[in-house]
């Protein structure tokens, strides 16, 4: 089995991604169609765009207040429905996703461009995460490359993620979360596992639940490979790092409330 370096894989993947993206998305460009799903008032236009623009303004106001000596972190907004918790409401729209910080630069004139760019960029990152996982497992380079393309240009993307861009987030997180599982099995540092659990939890609670189930199933499938390495000690590690991530999240929520 011939192993390919990360740089070679990334270069080949980037070129292949660009070619396939041009083929897949050309009709959108040719017909002047945006990725925003909203011709008949669907979620893209009625919810996602509004949530992202709100988030961008929220971040700008937060830094504006800090610059002017007022440390304010609003947690409630009466303009959301009949009044709602800001972070709790926006969590559904993956506002906790670090990539959404780019919307601090959003306004009415560039929001469509940012929205379209971030959808394609997330798709690209999902393939990068798949490649990182495959390379970590020392799989064949051609197999990794083929798998990454099949993974991202799948039915999930064309049926759901192209309408709801944050559906791409679990496609980015899953390979990295599974890599974290492998690292714990191999008695390596658990930092990647903790990081991915934390990011998944703050991004979207629905997908966090699904990713947790996937990680457990994967850990059980991989168990025969590592059963001689002390199963109960390894199980204890998995059980321990999830609460660590949760405690970290709760600490930040408490600070925000104060």
Predicted features along the sequence, with ranges:
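Membrane-interface transmembrane helices that cradle and orient dolichyl/undecaprenyl
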Residues: 177-192
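Hydrophobic core segments of transmembrane alpha-helices in multi-pass, intramembrane catalytic enzymes
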Residues: 123, 166-178, 210-218
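Conserved small/polar residues in nucleotide/adenosyl-binding loops
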Residues: 247-254
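Membrane-interface coil-to-helix junctions
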Residues: 22-127, 149, 153-171
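Perimembrane helix-loop-helix junctions
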Residues: 211-243
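Start-transfer (signal-anchor) and selected internal transmembrane alpha helices
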Residues: 1-31, 237-242
